[in-house]
Amino acid sequence: MLTAITGINWGDEGKGRMVDLLSQDYDIVARYQGGDNAGHTVKNERGKFVLNLIPSGILRPDVVCVMGGGMVIDPEHLEKEIAALTEKGVEISPKNLKISDRATITMPFHVAQDGLEEERLSKTGAQFGSTKRGIAYSYGDKFMKKTLRMGDLVHMDASVRKRLETIVESKNLTMVNIYGQQPVSVDEMWAWCERYAKLFAPYVCDVGQFLAEADDAGKKIMFEAQLGALRDIDFGIYPYTSSSNTVSAYAPIGAGIPGRKLTLSIGIMKAYSSCVGEGPFTTELAMTEADKDVLREHGHEYGAATGRPRRVGPFDAVASRYGVQCQGCDELALTLLDVLDYMEEVPVVTAYKLTDGTTTNRFPTGKTLDDAQPVVEMLPGWHCDISGVRKFEDLPAAARNYVTRLEELVGCKIKYISVGPERDACIVRD
């Protein structure tokens, strides 16, 4: 069984929380794209964990976690993440964490270039809101064949050294001539690679073969996405996207088994909207700044990976319907419904008004999206604490009506409803 857990919106939907819950029924959890720009927060009986690179299934002792070839991996960050988890009593070894030999390495110069370019762009207000983790530059060099992969750490021989020399020579053309930096040292980069080769070579393997054999043996495999549909490099709000494919169709590819088909696609959808970074975010126009500040505080809307305040707004049915379509969802998990407990009335963006005066419920692109205005429907609030509810029929009528209205608007059944950050704070509907 191959199941994809993906984001419907801009990211930060609560994927890590749902992966932690649902992985109890799975044997393997595999990340298939992205890097340490992810911030998957999990809160359970063992404490609070923020996972950037390692799949959220790592908190279950019987689950094997896989970092797929579609990922970009910063070994320096991975070392720190493993140390932080180990300090909290989470056991990590090559037995329960496997790293694809095809995964791209995020080198120190990728991180440096990301920060330098964002600083350059910010001088003219053209910045993208990058996390400055080197993600775009890792993927860019991957496609230009000018970086190393995790498999190279297993065979640190003269041929890898020669490739590194060519890579650094090319990178220095940019770092020195465009950004005015000191040239990158080949010797320093080689020493850096040797350090992480000793540390991570035992974890590196052909995860494609591992996953294929597991699938053939009837093992249950879950694919965990990073970010949401609206940040997909092809189907997101370009150029304000990530640099990888976040959609479910890419899950088997990025994980390492491109010829396999998904059995189930579960989309994670937030009960309101949030966004980190630049670009059009129509729903935020539907609330006053004061109301957004209150929502941000109630939802603790600050980036798990960056700490940056997130932009917030009402649930956006136009964007969410598009996200559901992109992810090919069979069912949905609605998260953070409890955050809306304080509202007397709950706004929902049901359509966009365009500059020609017409309205649409289809998600537009380009200039049309830039100029769109939200059309808002107000729904009754429930104005009580629902965090202790575990059955749908025990929710207040207004909360049940909110859930069913969202189902109507996005065209997909909501099976799971999260009413708190704890592992068991979830309603499962038949």
What do the predicted segments below correspond to?
Residues M1-D430:
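Non-transmembrane, aqueous-exposed alpha-helical and coiled segments at domain scale
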